[in-house]
Amino acid sequence: MSSSVSSTSAPTKIVIPDLVSHCTIPVRCNRHWKQASVESKRWLFRGGNLSDRKRDAFHGLKAGYLTSMCYPLAGYPQLRVSCDFMNYLFHLDNISDEMNDRGTHGTAVSVLDALYQPHMHPTSRVGKMTKDYWVRLIQTASPGAQQRFIETFDMFFQAVTQQAMDRANGVIPDLESYIAIRRDTSGCKPCWALIEYANNLDLPWEIMDHPIIRGLGEAANDLVTWSNDIFSYNVEQSKGDTHNMIVVVQNQQGLDLQSAVNFVGDLCKQSIDRFHYLRENLPSWGPELDREVEIYVDGLADWITGSLKWSFESERYFGKAGLEVKKTRVVALLPRRA
């Protein structure tokens, strides 16, 4: 179902919800983060052929800092691969925003070919970068983690292609459809496979497919993704981008902007509460597997709290005003680009 957002008197600011206070999970950070961050950016700049302006943006992005809070116990080799993937994922997000569905599909083919056939020699830049981190990752990742990474990354590209088609056709999906596709466009699911890789876990499918484990991953994905929709709304609205839950809620429920922000904020808080509830109701698979499950679930929790902290310290959403926004929760809206 598609329609346009009803026009109202244009607001000049929004007040974002206080998600940081609602999240009581402690922040942890990997001790190797500075070295991994520097070397990973160097890897991206060399492989991605970025302009000076885009390089500056990646310095302000601080993807290595995010990665180090999300994988705090990883050894240096695993952290470095995870940093490379995170920088690369943001790079893919940036280039996919500039593409139509055909361009997105071409990128997907290059990436997935490199993952499914690592013995081949890719010719595109993105294919070469994919192969480079993938051959390092598969040295120690369990077969299950490798398969989950590839399958969920494939789902990511299917969803991003659908998003590009919706953007081209001016389609704003209903909330239920948006939630389903956003869980894949977020890129969180392959990052959950990296939790297994970064911590040298070998979890069987019957555990990873358990409703509570899947529910924990979904709750973490929802918090990371929906809070991101709040934090990125200002930049996105200035570009006319409608792939955002705030826009979807305004469109479907006829809410004004601040009410829509509050609505999404309440959903974010509910996702944190859902995560804690499921975590307290984990079944047991025996002492050895329970320890691996605990490490995996801790990794999901690290993503929740790490992403919230990073969002205000990165320059991606609030420029250099992130810490001020964190304190006041007031975001002055950017003018729409012509």
Swiss-Prot record:
Residues that coordinate or bind Mg(2+) 1: D93
Lineage, top-rank taxon, reads: Eukaryota
Q: Name one GO biological process term.
A: isoprenoid biosynthetic process
Keyword Metal-binding listed? The answer is: yes
Residues that coordinate or bind (2E,6E)-farnesyl diphosphate: R316, Y317
Q: Which GO terms describe its molecular function?
A: alpha-copaene synthase activity; metal ion binding; terpene synthase activity
Short motif (NSE/DTE motif): ranges: 228-236
First-level EC class? lyase
Query: Which residue positions does UniProt flag as site: Plays a critical role in the stabilization of intermediate cation?
Result: F90
Annotated Mg(2+) 2 binding lies at: D93
Instruction: Spell out the protein name for this chain.
Output: Sesquiterpene synthase 2
Native species: Postia placenta (strain ATCC 44394 / Madison 698-R)
